[in-house]
C-alpha cells in the first residue's frame, strides 16, 4: 500500500479496492460545482482483508493531515472499524452497533466515523420497491454477510411491514455467525434463517425455496471488484420477484443472470446506481458539513446520468 502525499488542497478520499474504475472519479468535480465546494478526490486502494496496520496507517494519515477532510469507505467497512476503531474520537451508534464504518470525517478537531449504509440502503430500496411489496407474501434473500448485508438487513428488519422470512447465506462461517447474532438483537421475533453456502449451487437451492414476489439481493461484492456471481447460471429466480444487484460496475454477472429470466419470470431488476448516488452524497454531506436537499440530490442524479450515459 502506498499512502497519498500530504494534501495541498482540501481533499476527500475514496478507500476501496479498484477506486480508479469508479464513476465517482469522473463525477466528483461536477458534484463539487453543484454543491459549491472547493475540493478534490483521491483513491486509496487496499486489497480485500488487508493488513490491520495498513488500515491504521490510512486512518492516521487522514487524521493528522490538515487538508485531508475525510473519506468514503467501501469493501473495507468492517475491517477498518475492527483495525482502527480506537483511533476515532467519535463513532456514531450504527458504527458501534454494526462494527463498521463507511464515512470518515472531521469536526472541531475530532475524527468521526459513521456507518451510513443503514440509511443509504434504505433510501435506495425505497426508490424502487413498491410500498405494498411485502403484502404479496414474498421473502427477502440476502446473499452475503458483510457490511452491506448487515445494513440492508437491519433496514428491512426495522420496518413495520416485513417479508415472510429474511434469509441470509454466506460463503464463510465467521461473518454468517456474526450477522445472525446481530439480527437476533435487532429483531429477536423476526423470522430469519441463515445458511452456509460456499458453493453457488447451494445458493441456487436456497433461491429455489423462495416463494414468488420475493426480494433477492447480491451483497457479496462478486461482480464488481471480483468477477462472477454467487449463483450459478442454472439458477431459477422466483416469479414476480425484485432482484437487486448492489453493484453498478464490473461484470455484473448476477444482474445479467436475472435479466436473462426477467421477461419469462416477470422480474424487476435493479443495479446499484441509486445506491451509489445515495451512498456518496450522504458521506459527502458529512465530510463537508453541508445539507443535500432532495432538490439538490435530484440535480446530482440528473447530471450524473447525463455524464455516464444512463437512462433516467
Name every feature range the model reports, one short phrase each.
Residues 103-106, 223-299:
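Rossmann-fold NAD(P)-binding glycine/threonine-rich loop
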Residues 2-131, 250:
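Phosphate/diphosphate ligand-binding glycine-rich loop within oxidoreductases
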Residues 63, 172-175, 200-231:
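Rossmann-like NAD(P)-binding element
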Residues 161-189, 193:
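NAD(P)-binding Rossmann-fold cofactor-contacting core
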Residues 15-18, 112-118, 132-158, 170-175:
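Glycine-rich adenosine-cofactor-binding loop
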Residues 73, 218-222, 245:
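Redox-cofactor binding/interface segments in oxidoreductases and associated redox assembly factors
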Residues 4-8, 134-136, 159-161, 209-211, ...:
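Short, conserved loop/helix-junction motifs that constitute active-site signature segments
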Residues 294-312:
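A short, charged, Gly/Pro-tolerant segment at domain boundaries
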Amino acid at each position: 500500500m502506498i499512502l497519498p502525499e500530504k494534501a495541498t488542497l482540501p481533499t476527500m478520499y475514496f478507500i476501496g479496492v479498484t477506486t480508479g474504475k469508479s464513476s465517482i472519479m469522473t463525477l466528483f468535480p461536477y458534484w463539487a460545482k453543484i454543491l459549491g465546494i472547493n475540493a478534490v478526490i483521491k483513491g486509496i486502494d487496499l486489497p480485500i482483508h488487508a493488513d490491520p496496520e495498513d488500515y491504521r496507517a490510512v486512518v492516521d494519515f487522514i487524521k493528522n493531515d490538515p487538508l485531508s477532510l475525510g473519506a468514503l469507505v467501501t469493501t473495507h467497512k468492517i475491517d477498518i472499524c475492527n483495525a482502527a476503531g480506537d483511533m476515532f474520537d467519535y463513532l456514531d451508534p450504527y458504527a458501534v452497533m454494526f462494527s463498521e464504518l463507511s464515512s470518515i470525517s472531521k469536526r472541531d478537531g475530532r475524527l468521526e466515523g459513521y456507518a451510513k449504509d443503514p440509511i443509504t440502503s434504505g433510501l435506495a430500496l425505497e426508490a424502487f420497491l413498491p410500498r405494498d411489496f411485502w403484502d404479496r407474501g414474498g421473502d427477502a434473500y440476502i446473499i452475503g454477510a458483510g457490511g452491506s448485508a448487515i445494513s440492508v438487513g437491519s433496514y428491512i428488519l426495522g420496518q413495520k411491514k416485513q417479508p415472510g422470512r429474511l434469509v441470509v447465506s454466506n460463503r464463510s462461517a465467521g461473518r454468517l455467525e456474526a450477522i445472525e447474532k446481530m439480527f437476533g438483537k435487532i429483531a429477536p421475533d423476526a423470522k430469519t434463517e441463515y445458511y452456509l453456502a460456499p458453493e453457488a449451487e447451494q445458493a441456487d437451492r436456497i433461491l429455489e425455496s423462495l416463494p414468488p414476489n420475493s426480494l433477492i439481493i447480491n451483497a457479496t461484492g462478486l461482480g464488481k471488484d471480483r468477477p462472477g456471481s454467487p449463483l450459478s447460471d442454472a439458477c431459477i429466480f422466483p416469479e414476480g420477484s425484485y432482484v437487486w444487484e448492489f453493484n453498478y460496475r464490473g461484470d455484473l454477472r448476477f444482474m445479467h443472470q436475472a435479466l436473462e429470466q426477467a421477461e419469462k419470470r416477470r422480474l424487476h431488476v435493479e443495479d446499484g446506481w441509486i445506491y451509489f448516488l445515495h451512498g456518496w452524497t450522504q458521506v459527502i454531506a458529512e465530510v463537508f458539513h453541508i445539507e443535500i436537499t432532495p432538490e439538490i440530490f435530484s440535480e446530482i442524479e440528473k447530471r450524473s446520468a447525463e455524464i455516464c450515459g444512463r437512462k433516467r
